[in-house]
């Protein structure tokens, strides 16, 4: 009797700790419901995370981020807040030069247009749940924050590069460095150009980091572009990367460099996490 009970216990523990396959992705579970996620081979199809949806603390981070973005959006709608919002929730080269480094993060929660907010939060909800269920809520939060900061810095860095390219540092007045007037004039012109550089706001860069992570985890999952066109997720990701690359240097009002910076953050996060798990 005791031997039979011991065998049943061993069989139960073996089943609880062996990997459970969904498509060709592997999710390891244990008695504490902690899990690790990584891909082996090429995953296929749609993934069923329903067994983990009772872990509300993970997916609740998605709602926390949506709520924070909504609160900042509402703050933008009050006219008396306009000066404060422009100072503390827009990131630009001028803002960073004046010591407002926190704007690299706060801009990732900032939307003054409902359509902009809705588009980013709609995307965050669907892709953010994937990452939260696979990697945990804390991981999703960190990825959003880091992706947002990197996206802001990518925007500022690219705008600075474009400004310097249009007006090289070595110019007519630089040949007269001995003349204080020309040096002063160059400094003033540089400051004016810095102030005129476009500021950035929005969660797009942070959301792109999450999209990149999700796409790389599940590259063959079906995604319906605009709810109509079925695409494998890697094709979906490639289309948007190409769109942002082509859009660099255009004046279409879209922060393409920020999008690419966010996507690069998500790709690096995937490589670091996947490499650690495969060891």
Predicted regions and their residues:
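A detector for small-residue-rich transmembrane helices and their helix-helix packing motifs
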Residues: 5-279
């Amino acid at each position: 009797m005791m031997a039979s009970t011991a065998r049943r216990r061993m069989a139960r523990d073996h089943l609880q700790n062996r990997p459970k396959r969904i498509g060709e992705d592997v999710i390891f579970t244990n008695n504490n419901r902690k899990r690790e996620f990584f891909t082996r081979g090429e995953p296929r199809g749609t993934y069923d995370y329903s067994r983990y949806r009772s872990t509300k603390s993970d997916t609740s981070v998605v709602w926390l981020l949506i709520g924070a973005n909504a609160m900042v959006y509402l703050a933008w709608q009050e006219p008396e807040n306009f000066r404060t919002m422009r100072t503390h929730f827009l990131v630009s080269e001028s803002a960073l030069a004046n010591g407002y480094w926190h704007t690299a993060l706060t801009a990732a929660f900032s939307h003054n247009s409902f359509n902009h907010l809705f588009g980013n939060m709609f995307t965050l909800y669907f892709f953010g749940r994937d990452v939260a269920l696979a990697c945990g809520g804390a991981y999703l939060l960190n990825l959003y924050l880091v992706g947002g900061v990197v996206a802001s810095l990518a925007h500022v860095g690219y705008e600075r590069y474009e400004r310097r390219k249009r007006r090289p540092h070595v110019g007519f007045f630089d040949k007269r460095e001995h003349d204080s007037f020309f040096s002063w004039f160059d400094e003033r012109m540089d400051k004016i150009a810095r102030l005129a550089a476009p500021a950035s706001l929005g969660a797009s860069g942070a959301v792109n980091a999450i999209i990149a992570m999700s796409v790389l985890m599940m590259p063959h999952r079906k995604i319906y572009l605009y709810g109509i066109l079925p695409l494998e997720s890697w094709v979906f990701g490639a289309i948007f990367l190409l769109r942002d690359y082509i859009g660099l240097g255009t004046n279409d009002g879209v922060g393409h460099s920020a999008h690419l910076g966010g996507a690069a953050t998500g790709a690096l996060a995937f490589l670091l996490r996947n490499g650690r798990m495969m060891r």
